[in-house]
């Protein structure tokens, strides 16, 4: 179903069964598959392929040569009906690829709201990108990677399968991330190691002085005290009773399966 207020360029191909919302704009030489849903006000500039069981929300801007919802690159994939979901108000720049999930994973590759995916970013099968994230040019997420809200991934950075990047993290450019990066941390290098707290990012997002000091204290316990991880967790638990913002470290440790960068 194509809403009567949507614009479809004459050269675009919209397969029967696709849903195009009100005010959407499908530019020249785009292809939209039969199981695709595109929300209100979303713009496909030109030469874009959206395929498979893919749902795209409202007011997204998608630039030329992006490919969304295509078959993933997992060699075990056998055509299962896996999905891609993209939220609202994202900017997806030229030649970005976002692949559908796998039956062995969650079956879903998901991008949240208000993200910027710059040129040539790759989001592999079963990845989850949160809200208000920035993935710079040529950043590459392997399968099952999770990027939490407000994270920034530098250009030319590669992230290993199943890694988790915590909220408000900044990963420097040309890095290789092979383990999980706790919230609020700056990481860089190959393999990526911690380089302190993302103080500039936290200030921009309204963290107050007490919260920032608590985060710095937790960072020092984790990385500067020469404690084991279990010892650091115990000390951070005590700190979290006084400063709830530190609880985010503990919640992150509970999700980590690859170990954290040290």
Swiss-Prot record:
Pfam families, alphabetized: Acetyltransf_11, Hexapep
EC number(s) on file: 2.3.1.129
Enzyme class, broadest EC rank: transferase
Protein's recorded name: Acyl-[acyl-carrier-protein]--UDP-N-acetylglucosamine O-acyltransferase
Domain of life assignment: Bacteria
HAMAP family cross-referenced by the UniProt entry: LpxA (MF_00387)
SUPFAM superfamilies the UniProt entry points to: Trimeric LpxA-like enzymes (SSF51161)
GO biological process: lipid A biosynthetic process
Originating organism: Serratia proteamaculans (strain 568)
Chief location bin: cytoplasm
Biological classification of the source: Bacteria, Pseudomonadati, Pseudomonadota, Gammaproteobacteria, Enterobacterales
């Amino acid at each position: 179903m194509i809403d009567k207020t949507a614009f479809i360029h004459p050269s675009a191909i919209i397969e029967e069964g696709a849903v195009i919302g009100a005010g959407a704009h499908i530019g020249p030489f785009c292809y939209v598959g039969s199981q695709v849903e595109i929300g209100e006000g979303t713009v496909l500039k030109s030469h874009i392929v959206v395929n498979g069981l893919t749902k795209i929300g409202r007011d997204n801007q998608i630039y030329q040569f992006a490919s969304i919802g295509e078959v993933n690159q997992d060699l075990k994939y056998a055509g299962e009906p896996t999905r891609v979901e993209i939220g609202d108000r994202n900017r997806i720049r030229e030649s970005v690829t976002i692949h559908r999930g796998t039956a062995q994973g969650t079956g879903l590759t998901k991008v949240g709201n208000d993200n910027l995916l710059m040129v040539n970013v790759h989001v592999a099968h079963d990845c989850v990108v949160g809200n208000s994230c920035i993935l710079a040019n040529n950043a590459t997420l392997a399968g099952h990677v999770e990027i939490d809200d407000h994270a920034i991934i530098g250009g030319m950075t590669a992230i290993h399968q199943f890694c988790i990047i915590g909220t408000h993290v900044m990963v420097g450019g040309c890095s290789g991330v092979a383990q999980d990066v706790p919230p609020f941390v700056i990481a860089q290098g190959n393999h990526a190691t911690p380089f302190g707290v993302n103080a500039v990012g936290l200030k921009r997002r309204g963290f107050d002085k007490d919260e920032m000091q608590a985060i710095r204290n937790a960072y020092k316990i984790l990385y500067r005290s020469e404690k084991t991880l279990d010892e650091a967790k115990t000390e951070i638990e005590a700190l979290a009773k006084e400063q709830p913002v530190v609880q985010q470290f503990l919640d992150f440790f509970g999700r980590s399966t690859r170990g954290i960068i040290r």
